[in-house]
Amino acid sequence: MPEAFFAVDGDSYVPGVLTQGPWGAAMGGQIVGGLLGWGIERSGIDPDLQPARLTVDLLRPVLLEPVQIQTAVQREGRRIKLVDGTLVQNGKTVARASALFLRRGDHPDGEVWSPPLRMPPLPADADDFGADAPFFIWGYGANPQKGARGMAEWEQSDSQKFAWTRLFRPMVQGHPLTPLVRLAFVGDITSSLTHWGSGGLRYINADYTVTASRLPDGEYLGLAAQSHYGTAGVATGAATLFDRHGPIGTSSALALAQPADAFRPTYL
């Protein structure tokens, strides 16, 4: 089994080297959100409840040091459950999440409008990743039929972007990956996908949200960029989420402008 992102030490979670993100000596947003999603799911969720929405607030840089997770139920009813999660480091809250769970039931008859969307095909060599890669991503840019590993197809392009992702490392040592953790992880990629333009990636996200009408089936999650709007250094981006069967929900990310040389990924 691949090395996990975190090891357990008492009530703390100790980050490995692969938790570092592309914005300096701090954890990546997908790592922070993935761990919060893992902690919320571990707090005790009825399997008949659908994880319908997860919002992650990235309050400050999370250092490459041990963290603790705190969870609290804010609302629990017959058809709804709202759980908050907090990431604490050195006694300070560094990130938080809010997860909304809705009870599944009979689905109404009839058709409802939704825009027609298609994802590029799944990559054929998705098992070809390096031992030092935190996750697999296959990006598509100006040519949606010709992708490449990593984000090379996004470089200096203002075209619509797509990505297929595969999380293959456990979030926490000794605990298998779950569909909810995959959703929590991939939501952060929305920021890069939607805010990357002709000048490269010039925005860092302060949050992200994922919504899902059902859990993803399989290891692969896809993202199709839908919009980017920005004014005076503030931007909002939105994407549609896919699994191998089709659309499952949406994602969004709010972001702030950054210097051109601030984004320094070490693994893509």
PLM features per residue range, with description:
Residues 1-268:
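Terminal targeting signals and extreme-terminal segments of soluble enzymes
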